[in-house]
Amino acid sequence: MAAKGYEDAIISEHAASQMARRGISVALLKGVLRKPEQVMEVRPGRIILQSRARIGTHNQLVRVFVDVDVSPAQVVTVYRTSKIDKYWSEQ
């Protein structure tokens, strides 16, 4: 799936609360939405945008789940993980 910018996506209330709880800034989220390194379809209408980021002293993978079957697109949730190899697609 080709990378496309989703910077106009609305951040759901759930996603905003998860960002606050997980220490993910709006700037980091917007960066992934604007220019994701990878885009994967979970199911029709929902995609995952992900990018690697240096957070503190650690390399992390930021994963953003977006519903694209609504207009504008809506960020459902976002999290970061150190398990880059588990989720990174080499395709």
PLM regions: where:
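Ribonuclease/tRNase effector modules and their secretory precursors
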Residues: M1-Q91
